[in-house]
């Protein structure tokens, strides 16, 4: 397989349904390359999927209920950060918790996948994927890491409210690394397209992958 010669950031015009198909391809790839050390069950029940449960993974020592996060809008780019969705303003102009803060989600872990090498920018099969950077981390481990920087769920929700209410609210930078020009933690406003093509606004929290991965249970 030959990696395409360039890196491109895919834009929001890419249909969300197409992204979901690519996420399924990534899941198939992970089933072969990442979950091979235990037993994995893919969740097909829609109600469970809505609760953030994409698969169950059982090893000799642990059991994980996993929400998979594959960055399919970035192919052939080694992304140095991981983004957690904190808050959403939906097309009805109503604010709701994002998947990281949503209390209705019952997953206890996340699997983050960055596709750093592929033969195409539009995945059509597992064979298109050459290499990923993937890690499994529990939700508790992320909250513990955030707590070490002074953040908990209530403070994150309060921060999101201030960001929505005030366009000038600072998007905080914690432990800025001047040498690498990266933050350990940073809030960001973004817009994305839902399945029906409507624009939704979100607040995400960006964390450095190299810092977060130190708290992971499994790394590929």
Q: Whereabouts are the PLM-identified features?
A:
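Nucleic-acid endonuclease domains
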Residues: 1-52, 60, 64, 70-220
């Amino acid at each position: 397989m030959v990696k395409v010669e360039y890196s491109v950031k895919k834009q929001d015009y890419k249909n969300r349904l197409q992204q979901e198909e690519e996420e399924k391809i990534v899941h198939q790839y992970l089933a072969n390359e990442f979950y091979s050390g235990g037993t994995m069950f893919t969740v097909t029940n829609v109600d469970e999927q809505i609760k953030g449960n994409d698969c169950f993974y059982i090893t000799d020592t642990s059991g994980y209920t996993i929400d998979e996060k594959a960055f399919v809008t970035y192919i052939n780019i080694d992304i140095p950060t991981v983004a957690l969705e904190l808050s959403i303003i939906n097309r009805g102009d109503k604010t709701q918790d994002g998947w990281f803060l949503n209390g209705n989600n019952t997953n206890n872990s996340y699997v983050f996948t960055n596709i750093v090498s592929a033969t195409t920018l539009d995945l059509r099969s597992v064979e298109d994927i050459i290499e990923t950077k993937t890690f499994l981390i529990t939700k508790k481990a992320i909250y513990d890491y955030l707590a070490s920087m002074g953040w908990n769920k209530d403070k994150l929700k309060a921060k999101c409210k201030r960001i929505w209410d005030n366009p000038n609210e600072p998007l905080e930078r914690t432990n800025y690394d001047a040498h690498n020009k990266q933050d350990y933690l940073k809030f960001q406003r973004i817009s994305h397209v839902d399945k029906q093509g409507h624009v939704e606004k979100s607040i995400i929290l960006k964390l450095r992958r190299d810092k977060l991965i130190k708290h992971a249970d499994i790394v590929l």
